Swiss-Prot record:
Gene (UniProt): uppS
Disulfide topology: none
Name this protein carries in UniProt: Ditrans,polycis-undecaprenyl-diphosphate synthase ((2E,6E)-farnesyl-diphosphate specific)
Record's cofactor remark: Binds 2 magnesium ions per subunit.
Key words, A-Z: Cell shape, Cell wall biogenesis/degradation, Magnesium, Metal-binding, Peptidoglycan synthesis, Transferase
Organism this protein belongs to: Pseudomonas aeruginosa (strain ATCC 15692 / DSM 22644 / CIP 104116 / JCM 14847 / LMG 12228 / 1C / PRS 101 / PAO1)
Length: 251
């Protein structure tokens, strides 16, 4: 964390579970994909607010490893929307100094979509103002397993002793290993769970739940979440008195 203007404490890394697209559409008697399309506007709004506030990293849970279980026509529509959004939004991201990273297991995606992911990442690779991470075919359990497998290969190859494996080493092998841990995790749609998202990384994150469906979570809602975060005291196992005595930011 760091102090920003007017001594408002802003999270370095915000993670969001974008929930409620289907229910938003159903409420309006629209097909589910209409909710996902409307959700793109909310993504734009949240990026704007976070970048303006001084957030460094925004990670969005776009498609979980469990979402493949949804109806085939819905999954197909989501993949098409993802492809279109990547190609349409990459120029604007680049113009605004935003770097895009896709995290998750890409092997199950169509080669055309995988290529679009690589192209979008390459087009924005030099940007440093803000990092947008999109979690696609991602699961927190998968992330921990692939990190453990990387360490196991190091041990098997004689490059690492098993007793030298630490929490820090494992964390560094996660797909977000080179980024600060999330300070704030937001979930929209009224549900109160993290649904296999960034399981390791969210260990000390502040959780914020909104009843708004994702397409309705825009500028004002994002600012409200950041304002709520700035009022919290993050203790990391210490007492309030210890935190206050250290005279560090209360978030």
């Amino acid at each position: 964390m760091e102090k920003t203007r007017k001594d408002v404490c802003v999270p370095r890394h915000v993670a969001i579970i974008m929930d409620g697209n289907n229910r938003w559409a159903k409420k309006r008697l629209l097909p589910g994909v209409a909710g996902h399309k409307a959700g793109v506007d909310a993504v734009r709004a949240v990026i704007e607010v976070c970048a303006e506030a001084g957030v460094e990293v925004l990670t969005l849970f776009a498609f979980s490893s469990e979402n493949w279980q949804r109806p085939a026509d819905e999954v197909s529509a989501l993949m098409e929307l993802f492809l279109v959004a990547l190609r349409r939004e990459v120029r604007k991201l680049d113009e605004n100094g935003i770097r895009l990273r896709i995290i998750g297991d890409r092997t199950r995606f169509h080669p055309e979509l995988q290529a679009a992911m690589r192209e979008a990442e390459a087009a924005t690779a030099g940007n440093t103002r803000f990092l947008l991470q999109v979690a696609a075919n991602y699961g927190g359990q998968w992330d921990i397993v692939q990190a453990a497998q990387r360490l196991a290969r190091e041990v098997q190859g004689g490059h690492l002793a098993a007793d030298d494996i630490s929490a820090e080493l494992l964390q560094g092998c996660l797909v977000t290993g080179d980024q600060p841990l999330p300070d704030l995790c937001i979930r929209t749609g009224g549900e109160h769970r993290i649904s296999n998202f960034l399981l390791w990384q969210l260990a000390y994150a502040e959780l914020y739940f909104s009843d708004l469906f994702w397409p309705d979570f825009k500028h004002a809602a994002m600012r409200a979440a950041l304002a709520d975060f700035s009022k919290r005291q993050r203790r990391f196992g210490k007492t309030s008195e210890q935190v206050e005595a250290e005279a560090r930011p209360s978030c």
